[in-house]
């Protein structure tokens, strides 16, 4: 059910996100995701967790390369061994710091994934670091607690703005070359919930 929701939710969010009248689109399927995730978790368990960073890299590759904006596809060129190195160092330091370094580990992985993502000839850059992430997470947590949950919506919006603010594009994008794909135009009038539930129209 979680995998159905993750695929459906991404397809739905992408189909409802647009810029200059052109939509994003996620082309992944439930079947592909089930195979990838099931294999990844099984091998991670059998390897006592050492396969997990390789799975993360392969999942990022799948998730990114199945996403498009208009008629141009995003791409990912990360290296599994580099992800493993970041993960192993992060796990060791997380243990030594009683869990505090976990924010740096997550930030380092996220930054690596974004820095190895491209859209056409433009590359995405990330300035997300552990210290910033820890600070924003504490602010969100404290604000929600102090407002007894009432301020959760504000905190989430602040957190989203913070995260998106760490991303930028480096390179030229020819906006004239970006066009609505035929698949998007054909399905633009369909029910959005069909995307959420992974149902083909």
Give the positions of each predicted feature.
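Membrane-interfacial and juxtamembrane segments of integral membrane proteins
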Residues: 1-201
């Amino acid at each position: 059910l979680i995998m159905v929701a993750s695929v459906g939710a991404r397809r739905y969010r992408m189909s409802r996100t647009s810029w200059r009248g052109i939509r994003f689109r996620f082309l992944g399927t439930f079947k592909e995701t089930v195979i990838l995730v099931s294999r990844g978790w099984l091998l991670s368990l059998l390897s006592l967790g050492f396969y997990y960073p390789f799975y993360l890299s392969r999942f990022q590759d799948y998730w990114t390369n199945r996403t498009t904006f208009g008629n141009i596809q995003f791409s990912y060129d990360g290296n599994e061994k580099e992800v493993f190195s970041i993960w192993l160092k992060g796990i060791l330091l997380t243990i030594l710091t009683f869990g505090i370094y976990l924010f740096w580990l997550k930030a380092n992985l996220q930054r690596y994934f974004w820095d190895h993502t491209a859209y056409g000839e433009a590359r995405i850059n990330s300035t997300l670091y552990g210290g910033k992430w820890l600070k924003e997470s504490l602010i969100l947590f404290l604000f929600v607690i102090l407002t007894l949950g009432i301020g959760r919506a504000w905190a989430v919006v602040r957190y989203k703005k913070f995260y998106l603010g760490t991303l930028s594009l480096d390179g030229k994008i020819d906006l004239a070359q970006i066009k609505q794909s035929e698949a998007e135009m054909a399905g633009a009038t369909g029910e959005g919930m069909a995307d959420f539930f992974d149902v083909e129209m």
